[in-house]
UniProtKB/Swiss-Prot annotation:
Cofactor(s), names only, from the UniProt record: Zn(2+)
Protein name, as recorded: Small ribosomal subunit biogenesis GTPase RsgA
Assembly: Monomer. Associates with 30S ribosomal subunit, binds 16S rRNA.
Residue ranges annotated for the CP-type G domain, each copy included: 116-275
Binding site for GTP: 163-166, 217-225
Main location: cytoplasm
Binding site for Zn(2+): 299, 304, 306, 312
Xref: HAMAP family: GTPase_RsgA
Protein's GO biological process: ribosomal small subunit biogenesis
Length: 343
């Protein structure tokens, strides 16, 4: 069933209600923090944010007698938005509750704009973005390419992961093979696995060990099933595909960090069907298409838009087959979605 479009007034009312709820939550949070800080708090120590729940986060202690234990913490009002993977300074209170007093610098961050166009961090301090897709729901090259642009922009290594490889059949194999061939030709690391049958999971584990990785992808591609296969003791909830839309249903509602016994961490993020890139520039998008790198700056005209201009190096490469039409379509679609001031 198609999603009903909201008019401007309905969107305004929704945003107003959400703003009022956020203000009430912030007031409760401020009161709770004041009460905690008015009592006995332990010394400052470092911690790792492993999950985020509204006005509270779960912090894993990294030092001292409580190292490895998890505490629910409030945030001081002057702190920036924290996400799973953030390293913080915090102080422990009573009954497993604490207060975060500072955020430590991030080595990397994966961001996307929210529904109001405000930049929202998704995960912090990750080494690898694992872009998960599957035969069902049908994979969209444009979404994969958006993740790749975000990865290149953030300086984070991407891994393309086709899950549910056991669902490949005569009907979907041609389109899937054509999709995979594009990324293999570009040199992106790509792995085919089946969390259900266990195929390829040892190779995936080897790639994840020793790294901080984040799973991203649309709902229904089996991210939670992958987590369950990699970490059987976790038992994350798995949801079916919607029988009406063929799209995935959300089972992960907040990004959560898990530890591997052999070293390394994994952040499982909620599934999304769109990934906005309104925070990047046209130049960032062009740099995110790695096959463009040797061609940029070689067009006849310095301000070439790579559309219909004569002497365009990208159009010539497209004509010669050095750039795939699917990738050019994604590039143009992403550019069309950027705000005017990104040009």
């Amino acid at each position: 069933m198609a999603k009903r479009q909201l008019n401007r007034r309905q969107n305004w009312r929704i945003e107003k209600i959400q703003g009022e709820r956020a203000a009430r939550a912030a007031k409760r949070e401020s009161s709770a923090v004041e009460a905690l800080e008015g009592g006995d708090l332990g010394p400052e120590q470092t911690g790792l944010v492993i999950a985020h729940f509204g006005v509270q986060v779960e912090v894993e202690a990294r030092e001292g007698e409580t190292a490895g234990q998890v505490f629910r913490c409030y945030l001081r009002a002057n702190l920036p938005a924290l996400v799973t993977g953030d390293q913080v300074v915090w102080r422990a209170g009573n009954q497993g509750i604490g207060v975060i007093v500072a955020q430590l610098p991030r080595s990397t961050e994966l961001c996307r704009p929210d529904s109001r166009g405000q930049l929202k961090p998704v995960a912090a301090n990750v080494d690898m973005i694992v872009i998960v897709f599957a035969p069902m729901p049908e994979p969209h090259a444009n979404l994969i390419d958006r993740y790749l642009v975000a990865a290149e922009h953030a300086g984070i290594r991407p891994l393309l992961l086709l899950n549910k490889a056991d669902l490949i059949d005569e009907q979907n194999a041609p389109a899937l093979n054509a999709l995979l061939a594009v990324y293999r030709q570009l040199g992106y690391p790509l792995l085919e696995v089946s969390a259900h049958h266990g195929d390829g999971m040892e190779q995936l584990q080897a790639l994840l060990d020793g790294r901080i990785s984040v799973f991203v992808g649309q709902s229904g591609v089996g991210k939670s099933s992958l987590v369950n296969s990699l970490l059987p003791e976790v038992e994350t909830r798995v949801g079916p595909l919607s029988e009406f839309s063929g799209q995935g249903t959300h089972t992960t509602t907040t990004a959560r960090l898990f530890h591997f016994p052999g070293g390394g961490e994994l952040i499982d993020s909620p599934g999304i069907r769109e990934f906005g890139l309104g925070h990047v520039s046209r130049a960032d998008v062009e740099a995110g298409f790695i096959e463009f790198n040797d061609l940029l700056g070689t067009c006849r005209f310095r301000d070439c838009k790579h559309d219909r201009e004569p002497g365009c190096a990208l159009l010539k490469a497209l004509e010669d087959g050095r750039i795939q039409q699917q990738r050019m379509n994604s590039y143009r679609s992403i550019l069309a979605s950027l705000p005017d001031n990104s040009y």
